[in-house]
From Swiss-Prot:
Catalytic activity: 2-deoxy-alpha-D-ribose 1-phosphate = 2-deoxy-D-ribose 5-phosphate; alpha-D-ribose 1-phosphate = D-ribose 5-phosphate
Alphabetically ordered keywords of this record: Cytoplasm, Isomerase, Manganese, Metal-binding
NCBIfam families in the cross-refs: deoB (TIGR01696), PRK05362.1 (NF003766)
Matching InterPro entries: Alkaline_phosphatase_core_sf, DeoB, Metalloenzyme, Phosphopentomutase_DeoB_cap_sf
Name of the protein in its database record: Phosphopentomutase
GO molecular function, one term: magnesium ion binding
EC number: 5.4.2.7
Residues annotated for Mn(2+) 2 binding in this entry: D305, H310, H358
This protein's pathway: Carbohydrate degradation; 2-deoxy-D-ribose 1-phosphate degradation; D-glyceraldehyde 3-phosphate and acetaldehyde from 2-deoxy-alpha-D-ribose 1-phosphate: step 1/2
Function according to Swiss-Prot or TrEMBL: Isomerase that catalyzes the conversion of deoxy-ribose 1-phosphate (dRib-1-P) and ribose 1-phosphate (Rib-1-P) to deoxy-ribose 5-phosphate (dRib-5-P) and ribose 5-phosphate (Rib-5-P), respectively.
Native source organism of the sequence: Aliivibrio fischeri (strain MJ11)
Family from the record: Belongs to the phosphopentomutase family.
Listed cofactors: Mn(2+)
Gene (UniProt): deoB
Cofactor: how and how many bound: Binds 2 manganese ions.
Length: 406
């Protein structure tokens, strides 16, 4: 029986990519800089202290993959761990350093076209676009229209939004149109309807995602984003390994978290919503228990990116990694004879880096299974090597990009 479990540690890069200069990211290193700060005692909080401790990920080769990526071991990680899995690092072919590009490339379909972006920091959106959205949604106006941090924009505009009923429109360096609205005063259903309108109106702009950002709270300093985020993505430009498994093998793909949204539902046969790393772990375990032959269980752990990377919270990121590492054996112990477990990322988001955006980095490729030989996979030229490996594993037709490392 063949089953693959893919765990994406969203934003967990392991060193600047060779083309990082094109993105202003030379020297970025999400893992390395977190480990360095921890080792210096600069990432202590109520949940953790001291050096970054990831014994289970190190056994799977994480520390070695980081060394192969950057030329040096990350501070404090166990460089002498007994390696029980295959490990490597992968560079990105895709033109961007965003979530859809990274995930699609992991599934064998790199994004070789250029996304559309809203590059102006203020007055970011064309008036004709916002006019059409407001007219269709029957709204009197909007707030924002700028590049913004998702939490800061709530403090800046949340109270005015609650008073006026006008949605908050904002963007970032990614190919996104984000809409923040209060779940209680504006309504979650109204927000999702508004986002669908925006998705349709953005078709000519080649924008990757419209993101619904619902929040709650009584006022400034007390607003919190909820777990009802929704990503409305465009469809991948070609069949991913997910789609091929379903179409060619009658297989199953169980999405946990926001995976289904990222692939616009393409190739997804079942989806489970879960919020927060503990709940995502629990949902993943339940999916593995239920998984039959020719099944992919695919989980995105978004909190590494959204709660810690973008917010430049080194201590929070480190604590989340250590929690993840502590629970990893629960999944490893569930693997059957022919199963494979793949741990990877979709881009970097170095919490020590200037600004709040993603960073162009190599991603880890850690593979574990009873029949997977331990050792180095070396440098992979594209994330699509993962998709091609899955194509060989499940015996589907080949992907156009990538080389299998089986």
């Amino acid at each position: 029986m063949k089953r693959a479990i893919i765990l994406v540690l969203d934003s967990f890069g392991i060193g600047a990519a060779g083309d990082a200069d094109k993105f202003g990211d030379v020297g970025s290193d999400t893992m390395g800089h977190i480990a360095e700060q921890c080792d210096k005692g600069l990432a202590d909080n109520g949940n953790r202290k001291g050096s970054l401790t990831l014994p289970n990920l190190s056994k799977l080769g994480l520390a070695m993959a980081g060394k192969e990526s950057t030329g040096k071991f990350s501070a404090g990680l166990d460089a002498n761990a007994e390696i029980i899995g295959a490990y490597g690092h992968a560079a990105e072919l895709s033109s961007g350093k965003d979530t859809p590009s990274g995930h699609w490339e992991i599934a064998g379909v790199p994004v070789l076209f250029d996304w559309g972006y809203f590059t102006d920091k203020e007055n970011s959106f064309p008036k004709e676009l916002t006019d059409r959205i407001l007219e269709r949604a029957n709204l009197p106006g909007y707030l924002g229209n700028c590049h913004a941090s998702g939490t800061q924009v709530l403090d800046d505009l949340g109270e005015e939004h609650m008073k006026t009923g006008m949605p908050i429109f904002y963007t970032s360096a990614d190919s996104v149109f984000q809409i923040a609205c209060h779940e209680e005063t504006f309504g979650l259903d109204n927000l999702l309807t508004l986002c669908q309108i925006a998705r349709e109106e953005l078709e000519d702009y080649n924008i990757g995602r419209v993101i619904a950002r619902p929040f709650i709270g009584p006022g400034k300093g007390q607003f919190e984003r909820t777990g009802n985020r929704r990503d409305l993505s465009v469809e991948p430009p070609a069949a991913t390994i997910l789609q091929k498994l379903v179409d060619e093998k009658g297989g199953q793909v169980h999405s946990i978290g926001k995976i289904s949204d990222i692939y616009a539902g393409c190739g997804i046969t079942k989806k489970t919503k879960a919020t927060g790393i503990p709940a995502l772990f629990d949902a993943t375990k339940e999916a593995i228990e239920q998984a039959g032959d020719n099944t992919i269980v695919f989980t995105n752990f978004v909190d590494f990116d959204s709660a810690y990377g973008h917010r430049r919270d080194v201590a929070g990121y480190a604590a989340a990694l250590e929690y993840f590492d502590g629970r990893l054996p629960e999944i490893m112990d569930m693997l059957q004879e022919d199963d494979i477990l793949i741990l990877t990322a979709d881009h970097g988001c170095d919490p020590t880096w200037p600004g709040t955006d993603h960073t162009r980095e190599h991603i880890p490729v850690l593979v574990y299974g009873h029949k997977v030989p331990a050792g180095s996979l070396g440098r992979r030229d594209t994330f699509a090597d993962i998709g091609q490996t899955l194509a060989e594993y499940f015996e589907t037709s080949d992907m156009e990009y990538g080389k299998s490392f089986l």
